[in-house]
From Swiss-Prot:
This is Homeobox-leucine zipper protein HOX29. It comes from Oryza sativa subsp. japonica. SMART domains: HOX, START. One of its GO terms (molecular function) is lipid binding. Probable transcription factor that may be necessary for the proper patterning of vascular bundles. Its main location: nucleus. One of its GO terms (cellular component) is nucleus. Residues 64-106 form a coiled coil. Belongs to the HD-ZIP homeobox family. Class III subfamily. The gene is HOX29.
Length: 868
């Protein structure tokens, strides 16, 4: 017994020699979890392991994997602890700044109270007119409303500004140094002081996984944003990246360093000229003439601050450049200091006056929004730094074997090409073609942008397009969620795109491409979204779209699938100031990094408060909504059950500007034809987008207090309200039994809807068309198909069944139409993502409406289904 225990202990606890450990470690790094055969092979190859029990070798690998897992977990926790420590220190600093701000406000309030009391004591000595004026001034001084605080604070700042306004300086180094030091002082007072009243940006809460502390200005001149965060990079590298604004700010068209002057120890003064693209066709682009001052503070912090140079400050001037509007950058910049736990702590301030008077009133809120500045500039800088730091700390290979830097370059290329076409600046070679005056579609041509000077595709054939034409327009959207609209456009390209034009895009990549196609909507055999990458912050996706081309255009040219490189961002619906974009460009199958791109797409910018996001899933049957009566009747609730919906819409009304731009490569002699085709195509797209936006807007109109099922299927149309009742009545008529035992003819529509929605079997309704498509499914049906009600319309009946199921369907379909019902044996169906699901039995019946008894749709019920 004792000998047996000793033998057991000997096999359980083994002391390995250094040679044995080296051999085991070598295999571990090759294969952390070797099979039994691989372990036996190791014993044969390494004589040092010959006397080790094979079971003990298995135990060693188990222990080694466990130690590695513990090491990684310990490392992760230590890194998280360091990050939390640094974040806590940052929050304590922010708390100190807020305490100073509170003290300043208390002091100002007391000073105003003393002044008001003095005025009250002097009132009896005033004449009646003077007393009235003093009373008005007192009311202004003691009013604590938002308007009064903002206005009085603004005037107070103006008075202070007038008092401390220095005399104009010249363009000498001493004059520029004086401007730089003043800029540094004002910037630091904003970054770490109380010069600006900062409010936490809506939807941005600090935490270990947050991007940082984001704040926007309140009651100051212009628009301003402030960001504080931690980045795992050295201060010098952070400054190098942030100073290269075109690298991370996609709206930056160019930034030229006109002059550089030394300033003190390790300091520099730079004169910069910067141009920013306009985000929409409704406003001109902006430019800035700046002084930038880089220096190191006494505590070792690195600071880079900048401001506009104008007649107020003196210094050198820059002539106005047409068609740009000269904006003003108030003291801004970034403060970088080393963190105690490694990396850097960054304070970013962006403070601008974007001259909102120069744009139409409808888009003026874009230029008066501090949240927009925070999203597009301050947070963009932090996101870019976090992305680069994440890539530097680990080896990252993303989709299709590309490095993250190459994918960032592709995203930048897409955005820059879209912005360039959207702005259509003359120095880029763009000229505007005279409009026909029918609508607001603008056509511009760039004949200097020859896509084929040196470029060739994988076939070795050159790209021969001799010019590029851009059709662009902007439109106002109301009561629709920008992310939801772009998501629908992304997932349902067939609802708005023209397959013939996609084929034409492909043909422009070939030499000797022929005549223009006739524009027609649809013709797709399907699309496949191939994920390529997404940024470290999950708000942007880069993907390749594979379009199965079912077009009859130039079949000899297009005997292959079409590919689009696509970028989709702005997916967070609750973030204030978020800009949503869907930008794509045709690419060759080789997908080389230097391939020319002609980006087209959509950009939606909210211009007031976002929609209520309590019901983010739009689950109304979109197909029936699109085919229903006039949009006004749906929105106003004329067709029954819409009074509460209209009220909800009014309470959550929001507006957004959608900008659409499409580029077309063409040969010189086809310019007029391409222009006419592009104009008509743009009109078709605008019409489709308006139709989809109205449907999505209607689908959000859920009355307050409605149940979960009602929120999933809003009764905006009579069909949506009564379809579940028709399903149950038709089932009772054909099968002589109740589909749902708990409801009867006297039950309300809402109770029947809930019962059908939560039925355990998958219930699906399809249209009575030559190619039946699904129009409704309950929750179980959506789970089985792995889709949503909005996406359901793109699924045809025959694609749900496997081969045997399609044969059974073809056999039973005539019986369903003639007899009104059919029962089918168990089989297999396929979800929208290709996953197989088996079902025990399926029944089908014809659903008739409750009025005239006409056939409305066919309903299928899959019983006891499960994924294989």
């Amino acid at each position: 017994m004792v000998a047996s225990a000793a033998a057991m202990d000997a096999s359980k606890y083994v002391r390995y020699t250094p040679e044995q450990v080296e051999a085991l470690e070598r295999l571990y790094y090759e294969c952390p979890k070797p099979s039994s055969l691989r372990r036996q092979q190791l014993v044969r190859e390494c004589p040092a392991l010959a006397n080790v029990d094979p079971k003990q070798i298995k135990v060693w690998f188990q222990n080694r994997r466990c130690r590695e897992k513990q090491r990684k977990e310990s490392s992760r926790l230590q890194a998280l602890n360091r990050k939390l420590t640094a974040m806590n220190k940052l929050l304590m600093e922010e708390n100190d700044r807020l305490q100073k701000q509170v003290s300043q406000l208390v002091y100002d309030h007391g000073r105003h109270g003393v002044a008001a009391a003095g005025m009250m004591r002097r009132v009896p000595a005033f004449p009646p007119q003077a007393a009235a004026a003093a009373g008005h001034q007192l009311a202004t001084a003691t009013d604590t409303s938002c308007e009064s605080v903002v206005t009085s604070g603004h005037h107070h700042q103006q008075q202070q500004h007038n008092v401390v306004q220095p005399p104009p300086r010249d363009a000498s180094p001493a004059g520029l140094m004086s401007i730089a030091e003043e800029t540094l002082t004002e910037f630091l007072s904003k970054a770490t002081g109380t010069a600006v009243e900062w409010l936490q940006m809506p939807g941005m809460k600090p935490g270990p996984d947050s991007i940082g502390i984001i704040a926007i200005s309140h009651g100051c001149a212009g628009v301003a944003a402030r960001a504080c965060g931690l980045v795992g990079m050295e201060p010098a590298k952070v400054a190098e990246i942030l100073k290269d604004r075109p690298l991370w700010l996609r709206d930056c068209r160019s930034m030229d360093v006109v002059n550089v002057l030394p300033a003190g120890a390790n300091g520099t003064i730079e004169l910069l000229y910067m141009q920013l693209y306009a985000p929409t066709t409704l406003a001109p682009a902006r430019d800035f003439w700046l002084l930038r001052y880089t220096s190191i503070l006494d505590d070792g912090s690195l600071v880079v601050c900048e401001r506009s140079l104008s007649s107020k400050q003196g210094g050198p001037s820059m002539p106005l450049v047409q068609p740009f509007i000269r904006g003003e950058m108030l003291p801004s910049g970034f403060l970088i200091r080393p963190s105690d736990v490694g990396g850097s702590v960054i304070h970013i301030v962006d403070h601008m006056d974007l001259e909102p008077w120069s744009v139409p009133e409808v888009v003026r809120p874009l230029y008066e929004s501090s949240a927009m500045v925070a999203q597009k500039i301050s947070m963009a800088a932090l996101r870019y730094l976090r992305q680069v730091a994440h890539e530097d700390t680990r080896s990252v290979i993303t989709g299709w074997g590309r490095q993250p830097a190459a994918l960032r370059a592709l995203s930048q290329k897409l955005t820059r090409g879209f912005n360039e076409a959207l702005n259509g600046l003359a120095d880029d070679g763009w000229s505007v073609i005279e409009s026909d005056g029918v609508d607001d579609v603008c056509i511009s041509v760039n004949s200097s942008k020859v896509i084929g000077c040196n470029a060739t595709f994988s076939s070795g054939l050159p790209i021969v397009s001799t010019g590029v034409l851009c059709a662009k327009a902007s439109m106002l959207l109301q009561d629709v969620s920008p992310p939801s609209l772009l998501q629908f456009l992304r997932e349902h390209r067939s609802q708005w795109a023209d397959s013939n034009l996609d084929a034409f895009f492909a043909s422009t990549m070939k030499p000797n491409f022929c005549n223009l196609p006739m524009s027609r909507l649809g013709g797709f055999s399907g699309q496949v979204i191939l994920p390529l990458a997404h940024t470290f912050e999950p708000e942007e996706f880069l993907e390749v779209i594979k379009l199965g081309n079912a077009s009859n255009y130039q079949d000899t040219l297009v005997h292959r699938d079409l590919f689009l490189l696509q970028m989709y961002n702005g997916v967070e619906e609750s973030s204030a100031g978020t800009c949503s974009e869907l930008i794509f460009a045709p690419i060759d199958a080789s997908f080389s990094d230097d391939s020319p791109l002609l980006p087209s797409g959509f950009r939606i910018i909210p211009i007031d408060s976002p929609l209520d996001t309590s019901s983010p899933n739009c689950t109304l049957d979109l197909a029936s909504t699109l085919e229903a009566a006039t949009p006004r009747s749906r929105i106003s609730g004329v067709n029954g059950g819409g009074g509460g919906c209209a009220a909800a819409a009014a309470s959550s009304s929001s507006k957004a500007v959608m900008t659409i731009a499409f580029q077309f490569a063409f040969d010189g002699h086809l310019q007029d034809s391409v222009a006419a085709m592009a104009r008509q195509y743009m009109r078709n797209i605008i019409s489709s987008v308006q139709r989809i936006a109205v449907a999505l807007s209607s689908s959000r109109l859920v009355p307050p207090g409605a149940g979960a099922a009602a929120a999933q299927l809003s009764p905006v149309t009579p069909e949506a309200a009564t379809l579940p009742r028709w399903i149950c009545q038709s089932y009772r008529f054909h099968f002589g039994d109740e589909l749902i035992k708990s409801v009867d003819a006297n039950s309300s529509n809402e109770s029947i809807l809930k019962a059908v929605w939560h039925h355990p079997s998958a219930i699906l309704c399809c249209s009575l068309k030559a190619m039946p498509v699904f129009t409704f499914a309950n929750q179980s049906g959506l789970d089985m198909l792995e889709t949503t009600l909005v996406a359901l319309q793109d699924m045809t009946l025959e694609k749900v069944f496997d081969d045997q199921g399609r044969k059974n369907l073809c056999t039973e379909l005539p019986n369903i139409m003639e007899q009104g019902m059919a029962c089918m044996e168990g089989g297999v169906c396929v979800s929208s993502v290709g996953r197989a699901a088996s079902y025990e039995k399926a029944v089908a019946w014809k659903v008739v409406d409750g009025d005239g008894g006409g056939a409305h749709c066919i309903c299928f019920m899959f019983i006891n289904w499960t994924f294989l």
